[in-house]
Amino acid sequence: MSLLLPDSGLIFWMLLSFGIVFAVLAKYGFPVIIKMVEGRKTYIDESLEVAREANAQLSRLKEEGEAIVAAANKEQGRIMKEAMQEREKIIYEARKQAEIAAQKELDEVKRQIQIEKDEAIRDIRRQVALLSVDIAEKVIRKNLDDKQEQMGMIDRMLDEVLTKN
């Protein structure tokens, strides 16, 4: 049983050496250890505060990013709307100009057709007049073989000219 229950002298020397070690540690070791623990605690507290600030800043940045994305989407929508309006305007203007050009072209073609028609009518009238003169000349030559018929014809024509004027 001596192993389980130490002698009283051994207990005395164990308590004395424990007290001396404890006193030395209390005087020199514990203040250093406490100072190191407090320094570590301060460092951890500062790190936690920095982490909180970083989280808050991250949240603000995230909100700002979302606001920027929302503004960009709004701006994109506005730009798309303006582009669609501009496209419609350009299409409208192009159609309008095409209609004007087509109308001008149509008017020019109509005018050209009218000019050609008038020229054709004049040409036909000239040809009819020439044919009429040729026919009249041939008829008159046949009918006016004698002098008296010629003089009668001249008198009738002069009378017609005078009555018309």
UniProtKB/Swiss-Prot annotation:
The keyword Transcription regulation does not apply. InterPro entries: ATP_synth_b/b'su_bac/chlpt, ATP_synth_F0_bsu_bac, ATP_synthase_B_chain. The keyword Plastid does not apply. Keywords: ATP synthesis, Cell inner membrane, Cell membrane, CF(0), Hydrogen ion transport, Ion transport, Membrane, Transmembrane, Transmembrane helix, Transport. F-type ATPases have 2 components, F(1) - the catalytic core - and F(0) - the membrane proton channel. F(1) has five subunits: alpha(3), beta(3), gamma(1), delta(1), epsilon(1). F(0) has three main subunits: a(1), b(2) and c(10-14). The alpha and beta chains form an alternating ring which encloses part of the gamma chain. F(1) is attached to F(0) by a central stalk formed by the gamma and epsilon chains, while a peripheral stalk is formed by the delta and b chains. PANTHER family: ATP SYNTHASE SUBUNIT B (PTHR33445:SF1), ATP SYNTHASE SUBUNIT B', CHLOROPLASTIC (PTHR33445). F(1)F(0) ATP synthase produces ATP from ADP in the presence of a proton or sodium gradient. F-type ATPases consist of two structural domains, F(1) containing the extramembraneous catalytic core and F(0) containing the membrane proton channel, linked together by a central stalk and a peripheral stalk. During catalysis, ATP synthesis in the catalytic domain of F(1) is coupled via a rotary mechanism of the central stalk subunits to proton translocation. This is ATP synthase subunit b.
